[in-house]
Amino acid sequence: MKRILIAPVRFYQRFISPVFPPSCRFELTCSNYMIQAIEKHGFKGVLMGLARILRCHPWSKTGKDPVPDRFSLKRNQEGE
């Protein structure tokens, strides 16, 4: 199941992302965050990844935002 959820992210990383300049505001890119969240939390990791993508905009804070050990849709402040 996790491999099926990760496959579209890997497709994005391999074929779509290289076409655009890097724009992620966080350390651990949003696509890598999504993969780690899925590996750690299963389907809930998809929700965490989508929440992370919504947080990645020009007006957000930058820095480390690692995948938390427990499910959360909020930014992980442990990394700072």
UniProtKB/Swiss-Prot annotation:
Q: What is its main location?
A: membrane
**Its function?**
Could be involved in insertion of integral membrane proteins into the membrane.
Please give the start and end residues of each transmembrane region.
none
- The name on file for this protein is Putative membrane protein insertion efficiency factor
List the InterPro entries hit by this protein, alphabetically: Membr_insert_effic_factor_YidD (IPR002696)
Protein family (similarity comment)? Belongs to the UPF0161 family.
Localization: Cell membrane
Q: How does it sit in the membrane?
A: Peripheral membrane protein
Q: Where is the composition biased (Basic and acidic residues)?
A: 62-80
Q: Give the UniProt keywords, A-Z.
A: Cell membrane, Membrane
Q: Which NCBIfam families match?
A: membrane protein insertion efficiency factor YidD
Which parts of the sequence are annotated with region: Disordered? Answer: 60-80
Pfam families xref list: YidD
| Species, as recorded | Streptococcus pneumoniae serotype 4 (strain ATCC BAA-334 / TIGR4)
**GO cellular component terms?**
plasma membrane
